[in-house]
């Protein structure tokens, strides 16, 4: 039997006989286990007294909050009376997770891809076998709204109704905590370790005057079943534990390491209990519902309800379905009123394993129907997207317009399938988001560069150019080849720079008068000492500064479909070398030019580098040390000493410190009882407590001893304040941030830590003091021993 956790039970009882009640169209009423409360509570609810009504409302609120906590932070359900849009495609997508029938074999029944309905009832349910939450929404098709296109007075009036009857946010109580179970929590002979703050906030206060403070806790799950636990404060160090009754709960719920347990306490002090499994179900619905709701049955019931203007039921599993298929009408209208274009940057919320909510960014790469033959003009997953982060692509490559949040701070990308007219990139600065290291306004590359690499300077060859654009491409490829080789093997750069640049200068064959790409007034000091040509006729490049690129690969890492930002800087900047000595140069020595290597400017001596011009730099976003560390440091000192303004020296940004000073705590020390030599372990290379236990067993040749609590070993750790705690009580990331040293002790040693006899902890402290007095080595601070 399933349990109804309807949040509006009082409202349902009052409005059951309204014109939008369940009696319309022969719909069925479901009165099974409402709210999942005991029969006495249900009977008191029907009595109609004010006291019972208030208690029922309180129980409804806490159960609703528990249901939403188990469903996840992104679950949003409509309220009774809302106007929504139902998508049969999404409903079939949920059913297809456990159905093996081909979508082409399912008749369409001439249904519209979007059906406007009114919500008659919402029931929050839970699967008794798996504790997975799901909901049953009763919908009534509205024929008068089926042809609305998002414009007109009707929409405005409906928007006001939506504001009055829209879905309200669930009230969140502060007395709630959620913990991911560790291996020790799921052990049959262990207990559930509760964080101190969570225990003090959610559980009743303990009497700490007792030698072993303890109490009995009674918590109800989603089905109204009571679970009794013994809450005790004990151990060395002291901690909150749920002991008696916990192993029974773990075994009956089939909990494993990685599952999450939620505890909530309402205003009356009642405790509620829920679980959220780590493995998402293929379908959280009960088997009885799955058997009756096949793909063909779903569409036939919906088609019959639309034709007869009667109600139909929709079952929705929030943890098994990636997208909701019952959308608020106003949300749908807002999404189609402002159509999404190709190249639109957006953000979308996801529920990740490592965080309850995360916003991921992406770009729209296409707009087309998911199934143009069976569901033409459908808005369901009509957007093809590409994500900035690779792990998001595993979730979905198609989204719906109402799921995304187009941001004005992330402008559009130019994604065109046809060739552009032959003109310079006038809109480059208008299509880059903030933070771009090239333009100082941020952004991504023009998407067209990934599909047309040979059309870099299309049209620019007609502006004062003496050679075709292919010559520029050859020169740019040579710049890229040189930069890539020098970046991969910087040691050989200083010895090969003469030959490589010599070959590059001889092979380019580009007229110096045709390098017009950048405005010298907007790009100062790039051509120091000379101007090859005047580029003031190119105002579209105003403000474009590739020289200011500190890390050009920060925005498109591991994205093979985009050119990195480095390529854009290389392919857009051209440094001719055919005539390195300008006839108009009046200086006795060779002229100087600047080629920016992205992070710093290197000065080249013509005599030391085989006749290369002084101050040669290139717009290559790679850090290439061509002069060696000693000469580079001297040049940096000379450069810093010459920075003055009105006779006053300007502060120069100090270079980053060496890696030795920033990585002083890479490894964590591990000490084992009975071992005089410790070990070091790098926690950053581990993914969780399971990896930590395996690594510790490998270091000390203790295979199978640490992962099994029955073997008699305990793992403790101390933080920077010398407080000793048990490994596994805190989340993994918090543990990695505070751990200072890990200790491996036997069970007997931990239990006898407060005895009069000296423990190995005291012996370790004495050894540390002895080593400190002898000045043999630097001792570690040992934990403080407190005798009771």
Curated annotation (Swiss-Prot):
<comment type="function">
    <text>Auxin response factors (ARFs) are transcriptional factors that bind specifically to the DNA sequence 5'-TGTCTC-3' found in the auxin-responsive promoter elements (AuxREs). Could act as transcriptional activator or repressor. Formation of heterodimers with Aux/IAA proteins may alter their ability to modulate early auxin response genes expression.</text>
</comment>
<dbReference type="GO" id="GO:0003700">
    <property type="term" value="F:DNA-binding transcription factor activity"/>
</dbReference>
<keyword id="KW-0539">Nucleus</keyword>
<keyword id="KW-0927">Auxin signaling pathway</keyword>
<dbReference type="GO" id="GO:0010158">
    <property type="term" value="P:abaxial cell fate specification"/>
</dbReference>
<dbReference type="GO" id="GO:0010050">
    <property type="term" value="P:vegetative phase change"/>
</dbReference>
<dbReference type="Pfam" id="PF06507">
    <property type="entry name" value="ARF_AD"/>
</dbReference>
<dbReference type="Pfam" id="PF02362">
    <property type="entry name" value="B3"/>
</dbReference>
<dbReference type="InterPro" id="IPR015300">
    <property type="entry name" value="DNA-bd_pseudobarrel_sf"/>
</dbReference>
<keyword id="KW-0805">Transcription regulation</keyword>
<feature type="DNA-binding region" description="TF-B3">
    <location>
        <begin position="177"/>
        <end position="279"/>
    </location>
</feature>
<dbReference type="InterPro" id="IPR010525">
    <property type="entry name" value="ARF_dom"/>
</dbReference>
<keyword id="KW-0804">Transcription</keyword>
<keyword id="KW-0238">DNA-binding</keyword>
<comment type="subunit">
    <text>Homodimers and heterodimers.</text>
</comment>
<feature type="domain" description="PB1">
    <location>
        <begin position="665"/>
        <end position="747"/>
    </location>
</feature>
<dbReference type="InterPro" id="IPR044835">
    <property type="entry name" value="ARF_plant"/>
</dbReference>
<dbReference type="GO" id="GO:0009734">
    <property type="term" value="P:auxin-activated signaling pathway"/>
</dbReference>
<dbReference type="GO" id="GO:0005634">
    <property type="term" value="C:nucleus"/>
</dbReference>
<feature type="region of interest" description="Disordered">
    <location>
        <begin position="413"/>
        <end position="433"/>
    </location>
</feature>
<feature type="compositionally biased region" description="Low complexity">
    <location>
        <begin position="38"/>
        <end position="53"/>
    </location>
</feature>
<feature type="compositionally biased region" description="Acidic residues">
    <location>
        <begin position="1"/>
        <end position="19"/>
    </location>
</feature>
<dbReference type="InterPro" id="IPR053793">
    <property type="entry name" value="PB1-like"/>
</dbReference>
<protein>
    <recommendedName>
        <fullName>Auxin response factor 4</fullName>
    </recommendedName>
</protein>
<dbReference type="InterPro" id="IPR003340">
    <property type="entry name" value="B3_DNA-bd"/>
</dbReference>
<dbReference type="GO" id="GO:0000976">
    <property type="term" value="F:transcription cis-regulatory region binding"/>
</dbReference>
<comment type="similarity">
    <text>Belongs to the ARF family.</text>
</comment>
<feature type="region of interest" description="Disordered">
    <location>
        <begin position="1"/>
        <end position="53"/>
    </location>
</feature>
């Amino acid at each position: 039997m399933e349990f109804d956790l309807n949040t509006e039970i009082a409202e349902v009882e009052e409005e059951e006989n309204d014109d939008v009640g369940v009696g319309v169209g022969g719909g069925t009423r479901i009165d099974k286990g409402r709210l999942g409360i005991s029969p006495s509570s249900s009977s008191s609810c029907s009595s109609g007294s004010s006291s019972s009504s208030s208690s029922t409302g309180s129980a409804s609120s806490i159960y609703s909050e528990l249901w939403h906590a188990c469903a996840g932070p992104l679950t949003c359900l409509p309220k009774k009376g809302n106007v929504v849009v139902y998508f049969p495609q999404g409903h079939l997508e949920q059913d297809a997770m456990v159905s093996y029938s081909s979508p082409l074999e399912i008749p369409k029944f001439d249904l519209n891809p979007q059906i406007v309905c009114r919500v008659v009832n919402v029931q929050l349910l839970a699967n008794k076998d798996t504790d997975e939450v799901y909901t049953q929404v009763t919908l009534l098709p509205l024929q008068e709204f089926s042809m609305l296109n998002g414009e007109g007075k009707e929409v405005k009036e409906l928007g006001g109704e939506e504001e009055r009857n829209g879905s309200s946010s669930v009230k969140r109580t502060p007395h709630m905590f959620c913990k991911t179970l560790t291996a020790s929590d799921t052990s049959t002979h262990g207990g559930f370790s509760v964080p101190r703050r969570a225990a003090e906030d959610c559980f009743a206060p303990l009497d700490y005057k007792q030698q072993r403070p303890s109490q009995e806790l009674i918590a109800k799950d989603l089905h109204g079943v009571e679970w009794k636990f013994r809450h005790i404060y004990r151990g060395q160090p002291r901690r909150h534990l749920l002991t008696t009754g916990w192993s029974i709960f773990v075994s009956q719920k089939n909990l494993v390491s990685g599952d999450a347990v939620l505890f909530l306490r309402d205003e009356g002090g009642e405790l509620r209990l829920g679980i959220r499994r780590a493995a998402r179900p293929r379908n959280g619905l009960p088997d009885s519902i799955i058997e009756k709701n096949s793909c063909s049955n779903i569409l036939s019931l919906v088609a019959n309800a639309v034709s007869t203007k009667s109600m139909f039921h929709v079952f929705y599993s929030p943890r098994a379905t990636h997208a909701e298929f019952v959308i608020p009408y106003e949300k749908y209208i807002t999404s189609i009123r402002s159509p999404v274009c190709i190249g639109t940057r957006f953000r979308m919320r996801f529920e990740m394993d490592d965080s309850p909510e995360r916003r991921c960014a992406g770009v729209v790469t296409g707009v087309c129907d998911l199934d143009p033959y069976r569901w033409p003009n459908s808005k369901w997953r009509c957007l093809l997207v590409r994500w900035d982060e690779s792990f998001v692509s595993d979730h979905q490559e198609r989204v719906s317009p109402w799921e995304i949040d187009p941001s004005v701070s992330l402008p559009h990308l130019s994604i065109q399938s046809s060739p552009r007219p032959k003109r310079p990139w006038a809109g480059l600065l208008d299509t880059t988001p903030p933070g771009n290291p090239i333009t100082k306004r941020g952004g991504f590359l023009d998407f067209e560069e990934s599909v047309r690499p040979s059309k870099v300077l299309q049209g620019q060859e007609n502006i004062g150019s003496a050679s075709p654009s292919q010559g520029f491409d050859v020169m740019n490829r040579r710049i890229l080849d040189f930069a890539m080789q020098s970046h991969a093997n910087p040691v050989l750069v200083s010895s090969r720079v003469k030959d490589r640049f010599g070959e590059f200068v001889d092979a380019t064959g580009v007229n110096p008068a045709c390098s017009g790409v950048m405005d010298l007034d907007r790009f100062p000091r790039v051509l120091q000492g000379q101007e090859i040509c005047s580029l003031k006729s190119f105002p579209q490049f105003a403000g474009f500064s590739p020289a200011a690129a500190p890390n050009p690969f920060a925005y498109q890492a591991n994205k093979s479909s985009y050119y990195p930002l480095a390529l854009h800087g290389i392919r857009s900047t051209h440094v001719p070398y055919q005539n390195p000595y300008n006839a108009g140069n009046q200086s006795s020595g060779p002229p100087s030019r600047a080629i920016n290597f992205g992070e710093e400017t290197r000065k080249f001596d013509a005599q030391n580098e085989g006749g290369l011009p002084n101050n040669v730099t290139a717009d290559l976003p790679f850090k290439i040390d061509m002069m060696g560390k000693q000469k580079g440091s001297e040049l940096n000192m000379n450069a810093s000493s010459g920075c003055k303004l009105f006779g006053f020296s300007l502060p120069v940004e100090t270079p980053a410190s060496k890696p030795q000073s920033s990585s002083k705590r890479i490894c964590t020390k591990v000490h084992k009882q009975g071992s005089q030599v410790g070990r070091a372990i790098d926690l950053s290379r581990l993914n969780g407590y399971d990896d930590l236990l395996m690594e510790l067993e490998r270091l000390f040749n203790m295979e199978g001893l640490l992962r099994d609590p029955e073997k008699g070993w305990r793992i403790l750790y101390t933080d920077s304040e010398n407080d000793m705690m048990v490994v596994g009580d805190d989340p993994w990331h918090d543990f990695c941030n505070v751990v200072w040293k890990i200790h491996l002790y036997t069970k007997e040693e931990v239990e006898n830590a407060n005895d009069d006899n000296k423990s190995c902890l005291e012996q370790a402290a004495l050894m540390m003091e002895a080593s400190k007095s002898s000045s043999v080595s630097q001792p570690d601070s040992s934990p403080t021993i407190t005798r009771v």
